[in-house]
Amino acid sequence: VQQAQTLTLTSRAFYNDKLGKYEKYITELFGFDKILPMNTGAEAVETAIKICRKWAYEKKGISENEAQIIVCDGNFHGRTTTIISFSNDENARKNFGPYTAGFIKIAYDDLDALEKAITSSNNIAGFLVEPIQGEAGVYVPSATYLAKAKALCEAHNVLFIADEVQTGIARTGSLLAVCGNCTCENQCEK
């Protein structure tokens, strides 16, 4: 509470003596190796897209400018030009083109569609998904969807990217919604 009253938002461009302590705390809490804090959800998703593409070119060996990221119909990841490029919301898209290429849309909560998209090309870099879709009308996937989607991504060397902006930090009863059925020791609250 005291910190929230002193400084709640800062950029990594400016030094503060709390960021390192926060990063240590949050990585230990979630069992992560690293964290890159962002100020907004759209900034977090844009950064995830950039990291995914960079990884695809430098680690997976996809030819430059050929990486594809799978996204779901009915998604809401923000309102930036890149993000609206793969949105179904015509109110968000109208008169903002041309749009950013490099995305494949599939049905949400459809493992067959995900597998078909992943195996359709050697240029698949990542799968960006909301653990619970909010913009589409609060759509909760089947109980095994996220775990099976992650396993499918791992089996095909595709990054699994969960957008927890609207669902994370215990908003769904789990620290992370993607861990709703988690049994990972020291990785979440269960």
Predicted features and spans:
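Conserved N-terminal phosphate-binding loop of PLP-dependent enzymes in the Aspartate aminotransferase
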Residues: 1-190
